[in-house]
Amino acid sequence: MYSFVSEETGTLIVNSVLLFLAFVVFLLVTLAILTALRLCAYCCNIVNVSLVKPTVYVYSRVKNLNSSEGVPDLLV
């Protein structure tokens, strides 16, 4: 049977291809993790804007109104 390349060259080519594929898989996994973290940060921002900030605003507004009118802190 005829061989176009030597065994050492064939092994080097196969190892290079496998190393390249491992690098591509590593990049895909890294990209997936970064995308998941970005989605998590986006969802946390939605929760912050829609729930936390209005609550803090209402709390501070009521506290300021109570302190300016001399009413005891019954509403807070």
UniProtKB/Swiss-Prot annotation:
Biological process according to GO: disruption of plasma membrane integrity in another organism; viral budding from Golgi membrane
A GO molecular-function annotation: identical protein binding
InterPro entries, per database record: E_protein_bCoV (IPR043506), E_protein_CoV (IPR003873), E_SARS-CoV-2 (IPR044377)
Localization of this protein: Host endoplasmic reticulum-Golgi intermediate compartment; Host Golgi apparatus membrane
Intravirion domain ranges by topology: 38-76
Record field: transmembrane: 17-37
Motif segment (PDZ-binding): 73-76
Subunit structure: Homopentamer. Interacts with membrane protein M in the budding compartment of the host cell, which is located between endoplasmic reticulum and the Golgi complex. Interacts with Nucleoprotein. Interacts with the accessory proteins 3a and 7a. Interacts (via C-terminus) with human PALS1 (via PDZ domain); this inhibits the interaction between human PALS1 and human CRB3, and causes delayed tight junction formation and defective cell polarity.
Family designation: Belongs to the betacoronaviruses E protein family.
Protein name: Envelope small membrane protein
Gene source species: Severe acute respiratory syndrome coronavirus
Gene name of the encoded protein: E
